């Protein structure tokens, strides 16, 4: 069994050694330009076209929760990956726990009005504010996949009213489910906090725009943990300036790194983190990949395979 590995920023040597230990029967090598030797599996992130083109692979593993970079490259270069080759993403591997920490901490930050108190502190102003009430602080999750379900579970502990929206209806205990475009307006109408965990597909690009924001309650909050392309940044800035959106926590952006001239940097109602809400945990990823390869070698049916037509 031959495995090729490519990631532009990861510690390649660590990964190769960890994979060799986890899959002793495998010959693991770092892929370099010009390497056309045979391979059974490819572990990749933003791979060059030549790495995968023409190979008879058993599977490709994307080293992250999203596969949009691979799928977008496939649109431009269909020859990069044969249609018969399964594509897998890292469904969790510790990312669910990180998303839970990030989402819960920020929801509580807004619920306890720490954002308002920070603004008061900046002007040396002492003024206790009325508290928010849980029953009026409905949290809506856009995107009800693996990470969305994890976030919903963690927020249930705090007894907030919860709802989710996705392409198909979900049966999550304690979470009101909405499905399809025809139910999006009803979903949005009660969301004091909107958490975006949608996949990046042609249908979801620009979905958080002026039209969507107008359907939220006045003074809603936005937490974007998915992809920057989901948000029309000018529309969000206008909503923040008008008070329609009271605050935004943004981990992802249309351009990354976020350009210094972006107005988001200086907005008093925006908090920015540099795409760190959930990062790949190498040890857990290696364990998942080695287990999945073992199952593939046995011919077992697996979860986590990407539907290329849907984009996730």
Swiss-Prot record:
GO cellular component: cytosol
CDD domains (alphabetical): GDH_like_2
Reaction(s) the record says it catalyses: glycolate + NADP(+) = glyoxylate + NADPH + H(+); (R)-glycerate + NAD(+) = 3-hydroxypyruvate + NADH + H(+); (R)-glycerate + NADP(+) = 3-hydroxypyruvate + NADPH + H(+)
Top-level lineage group: Bacteria
GO molecular function terms noted in the UniProt entry: glyoxylate reductase (NADPH) activity; hydroxypyruvate reductase (NADH) activity; hydroxypyruvate reductase (NADPH) activity; NAD binding
One Pfam family per UniProt: 2-Hacid_dh_C
Signal sequence coordinates: none
EC code: 1.1.1.79, 1.1.1.81
Entry's localization field: Cytoplasm
UniProt cross-references to PROSITE patterns, sorted A to Z: D_2_HYDROXYACID_DH_3
Principal localisation: cytoplasm
InterPro entries: D-isomer_DH_CS (IPR029753), D-isomer_DH_NAD-bd (IPR006140), GhrA_Enterobacterales (IPR023514), NAD(P)-bd_dom_sf (IPR036291)
Active site annotation, chain numbering: 227, 275
Keywords in alphabetical order: Cytoplasm, NAD, NADP, Oxidoreductase
Coiled coil: none
Its job: Catalyzes the NADPH-dependent reduction of glyoxylate and hydroxypyruvate into glycolate and glycerate, respectively.
Similarity comment text for this entry: Belongs to the D-isomer specific 2-hydroxyacid dehydrogenase family. GhrA subfamily.
Protein name per UniProt: Glyoxylate/hydroxypyruvate reductase A
Native organism: Escherichia coli O6:H1 (strain CFT073 / ATCC 700928 / UPEC)
